């Protein structure tokens, strides 16, 4: 008898931390990357959760720092023939699905995502087969193979709007893979949602009791929460949203002190947006609890300067993203549906 994969009990081995670089080494690799980007007609696309020095380099070279939805838009529209995707593997796959004519490079193809790892395609297909009457909606944080099974792909920035739209059509939903985001969307929309039970190893670690103590210490602070966090954390929030939405909330909220419950990589762009405000990390440990990710994705941390330089210089199978063409064509359908729907929201 086969055993159903249980993402709740899965323990993912973390990658080794990159070797720290000296100041001189960082300067060397920065200049090398800038030169190689020009020589290769390449542009950097970096996620908010990468390290600050990577985001800074993307800015300086005319690239993009954004959430996964805007990364997809930017990469597809940019005239560069090569995209250097600083993020995790599903982001590189998504770039290749949307831009098959372009060379897609990543600093490492071993940069995983616990949500992706927690949704193996064979088990997910069986889950969908058991509920054939439901519309399949998968989060962007999934493999190309899982996207290919879906009716829709969605990011956290438009999840509530999309599910509300599908609910208005009377559709019942399979949601995968993030259980916390699925629960949040269900609560916001009232839709009939059957959730896969995955979780982000970063957001799943935020602790309610420790956050309560921090709130008591700073009663004037607003709490900003990503909806991949547990429900108890979301319920404490003054603002809930995707990475880009949290940065927008930081600007509009009147509070001068902000407690932020998402990957601390976001602090680079958020501090730019609100230079006069104090940003505090929401706690991931306390009351005897320990943390593994400690508010920073270990796979995002693999996107170092040395690895980026090697990707641009060496190319090849160790850095280039490939997606089977038949799989790409199937995954493109729900991705295009997402982009078309997002365009209607932007007016």
Swiss-Prot record:
A single cellular component GO annotation: cytosol
Cofactor(s) this protein cannot do without: [4Fe-4S] cluster
Top-level taxonomic group: Bacteria
UniProt-annotated location(s): Cytoplasm
Keyword Transferase: yes
UniProt cross-references to Gene3D superfamilies, sorted A to Z: NadA-like
Keyword Amino-acid biosynthesis: no
InterPro entries: NadA, NadA_sf, Quinolinate_synth_A_type1
Enzyme type, top EC level: transferase
EC code: 2.5.1.72
Binding site for iminosuccinate: 47, 68, 139-141, 156, 226-228, 243
Pathway of action: Cofactor biosynthesis; NAD(+) biosynthesis; quinolinate from iminoaspartate: step 1/1
Amino-acid positions noted as binding [4Fe-4S] cluster in the UniProt annotation, renumbered to this chain: 113, 200, 297
GO molecular function: 4 iron, 4 sulfur cluster binding; metal ion binding; quinolinate synthetase A activity
GO biological process: 'de novo' NAD biosynthetic process from L-aspartate
Keywords in alphabetical order: 4Fe-4S, Cytoplasm, Iron, Iron-sulfur, Metal-binding, Pyridine nucleotide biosynthesis, Transferase
Family of this protein: Belongs to the quinolinate synthase family. Type 1 subfamily.
Function: Catalyzes the condensation of iminoaspartate with dihydroxyacetone phosphate to form quinolinate.
UniProt protein name: Quinolinate synthase
């Amino acid at each position: 008898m086969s055993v159903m994969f249980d993402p709740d009990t899965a323990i993912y081995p973390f990658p080794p931390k990159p070797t720290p670089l000296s100041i001189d080494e960082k300067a060397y690799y920065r200049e090398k990357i800038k030169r190689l980007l020009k020589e290769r007609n390449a542009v950097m696309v970096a996620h908010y959760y990468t390290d600050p020095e990577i985001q800074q380099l993307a800015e300086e070279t005319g690239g993009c720092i954004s959430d996964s939805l805007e990364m997809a838009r930017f990469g597809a529209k940019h005239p560069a023939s090569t995209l250097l995707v600083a993020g995790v593997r599903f982001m590189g796959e998504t770039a290749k699905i949307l831009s098959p004519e372009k060379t897609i490079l990543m600093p490492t193809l071993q940069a995983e995502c616990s949500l992706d790892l927690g949704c193996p395609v064979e088990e997910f297909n069986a889950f969908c087969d058991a509920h054939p009457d439901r519309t399949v909606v998968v989060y962007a944080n999934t493999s190309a193979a899982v996207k290919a099974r879906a009716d829709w792909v969605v990011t956290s920035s438009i999840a509530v709007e999309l599910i509300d739209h599908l609910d208005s059509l009377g559709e019942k939903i399979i949601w995968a893979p993030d259980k916390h985001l699925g629960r949040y969307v269900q609560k916001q929309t009232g839709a009939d949602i059957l959730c896969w039970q995955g979780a982000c190893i970063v957001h799943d670690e935020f602790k309610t009791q420790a956050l309560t103590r921090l709130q008591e210490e700073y009663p004037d602070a607003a709490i900003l929460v990503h909806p991949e966090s547990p429900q108890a954390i979301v319920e404490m929030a003054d603002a809930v949203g995707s990475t880009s939405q949290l940065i927008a909330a930081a600007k509009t909220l009147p509070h001068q002190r902000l407690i932020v419950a998402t990957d601390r990589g976001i602090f680079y762009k958020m501090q730019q947006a609100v230079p006069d405000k104090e940003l505090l990390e929401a706690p991931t440990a306390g009351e005897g609890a320990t943390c593994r990710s400690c508010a920073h994705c270990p796979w995002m941390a693999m996107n170092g300067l040395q690895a980026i330089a090697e990707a641009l210089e060496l190319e090849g199978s160790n850095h280039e993203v490939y997606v089977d063409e038949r799989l790409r064509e199937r995954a493109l359908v729900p991705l295009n549906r997402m982009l078309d729907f997002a365009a209607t929201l932007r007016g």
